[in-house]
Amino acid sequence: VHLTGEEKSAVTTLWGKVNVEEVGGEALGRLLVVYPWTQRFFESFGDLSSPDAVMNNPKVKAHGKKVLGAFSDGLAHLDNLKGTFAQLSELHCDKLHVDPENFRLLGNVLVCVLAHHFGKEFTPQVQAAYQKVVAGVANALAHKYH
């Protein structure tokens, strides 16, 4: 992902304020609610029968935290996202058979959740930088599929 110095600064400054557990759980939960077909990958998580059940499910929250932990690793290696996410790409492609489009959807949901959490601090410039990052991460996660 090519970011200007200003964009990198905007991304890392905001990310330093992110509660990974809270935002991760909310982002994954919203993905599962808005795109219910994605729930098929999480059948072992128990009750996903309603939006409230999804958003309050401890396994959804825990996995969301794990997902954003990996995203944090990506932010530390923006010039090598494919290498950073190679093992996760292989896992999601070969073992889990996740449609790579879901990575793009989750990235867009994450941007919405960040905007909701940070309000005016999530300026159009910050949003544009995050769109570049989530697109780069989604592309790296989809790499094994190509």
Curated annotation (Swiss-Prot):
The record's section on Gene3D superfamilies has: Globins
UniProt: heme b binding residues = 63, 92
Tissue-level expression reads: Red blood cells.
Chain coiled-coil ranges: none
* GO biological process terms held by the UniProt record: hydrogen peroxide catabolic process
Q: Which residues carry this modification: N6-acetyllysine?
A: 59, 82, 144
Phosphothreonine: residues carrying this PTM: 12
S-nitrosocysteine is found on: 93
Checking PROSITE patterns in the record gives: GLOBIN
Q: Which terms does the record give in the GO molecular function aspect?
A: haptoglobin binding; heme binding; hemoglobin alpha binding; metal ion binding; organic acid binding; oxygen binding; oxygen carrier activity; peroxidase activity
Could you tell me the keywords of this UniProt record?
Answer: Acetylation, Heme, Iron, Metal-binding, Oxygen transport, Phosphoprotein, S-nitrosylation, Transport
* Gene Ontology CC terms: blood microparticle; haptoglobin-hemoglobin complex; hemoglobin complex
List Phosphoserine occurrences by residue.
44
Q: Name one Pfam family in it.
A: Globin
Question: What InterPro entries does the entry give?
Answer: Globin, Globin-like_sf, Globin/Proto, Hemoglobin_b, Hemoglobin_oxygen_transport
Task: List S-S links within the chain.
Answer: none
Q: Globin domain: from which residue to which, for each copy?
A: 2-146
Identify residues that carry N-acetylvaline: 1
Asked if the record carries the keyword Transmembrane helix, the reply is: no
Role according to the record: Involved in oxygen transport from the lung to the various peripheral tissues.
Entry's family note:
Belongs to the globin family.
Subunit and interaction comment:
Heterotetramer of two alpha chains and two beta chains.
Record protein name field: Hemoglobin subunit beta
* Organism, scientific name: Leontocebus nigricollis (Black-mantled tamarin)
